[in-house]
Every structure is written in C-alpha cells, then in structure tokens.
Amino acid sequence: MPKANNAVASKARRKRVLKKAKGFWGSRGNILTVVKHAVDKAEQYAYRDRRVKKRTFRSLWIMRINAAARLNGTTYSRMINAMLKKNVEIDRKALAEIAVKDPAAFTVIVKSLFE
C-alpha cells in the first residue's frame, strides 16, 4: 500500500514559509531549503532588533536633549542631575520632543532647573 503524504498540509506548510520570504532575492525567495534558512535568520534579526530599537531611540533622545541643553549653556548630565534634585519627572522621550518641536519651552524648562 502506498504511503500517504498528506499533501494538503505539506503544501500549506511550504506556502506559509514561502509567503514569509516574499521580496527575498534569488534562491532565498524560491528554493524551499534556502528559504527556510533565510526566514529563520530574518526572524532572529527581527527579534533582536525589536530590543535594539529601544536602545537606539533612547540614545537618539539623549543626543537631542544634549544638543538643545548645550544651546542653553549647560550639558545633558548637568541637566538630568538638576532634574533629579528638583524631582522633575519628564521622561527623555518627552524632553527630546520638546527640544525639537518647541525650543522656547525647552529654554524655560532649563532656566527653571537652574534658578
């Protein structure tokens, strides 16, 4: 008796993997064994970079705050220290947004910290 391979499930599985590889170049997008490796690696990078993104954005916010602080005659570290001493609880994301979108308001914040 011939072996039943369950073609429906096999085809669905292949289709699912190939769908994840849409847009991949060359054999990475159409040869199943290569596609499996490419998709696995892509998912590893995606997992890692979801975490790296948080670090990258925090770093960007700090750079923006530091640049704006230096325009106002202080530095990032002095400003954060003053915020801690005065119990000002504005997070870095919001501070960076204020620094970019409304420099006048940022200047007011800096002056209030060093009074």
Swiss-Prot record:
Keywords: Ribonucleoprotein, Ribosomal protein, RNA-binding, rRNA-binding. GO terms for biological process: ribosomal large subunit assembly; translation. GO terms for cellular component: ribonucleoprotein complex; ribosome. The keyword rRNA-binding applies. GO terms for molecular function: rRNA binding; structural constituent of ribosome. CDD domains: Ribosomal_L20 (cd07026). SUPFAM superfamilies: Ribosomal protein L20 (SSF74731). Binds directly to 23S ribosomal RNA and is necessary for the in vitro assembly process of the 50S ribosomal subunit. It is not involved in the protein synthesizing functions of that subunit. Belongs to the bacterial ribosomal protein bL20 family. HAMAP family: Ribosomal_bL20 (MF_00382). This is Large ribosomal subunit protein bL20. It comes from Pelodictyon phaeoclathratiforme (strain DSM 5477 / BU-1).
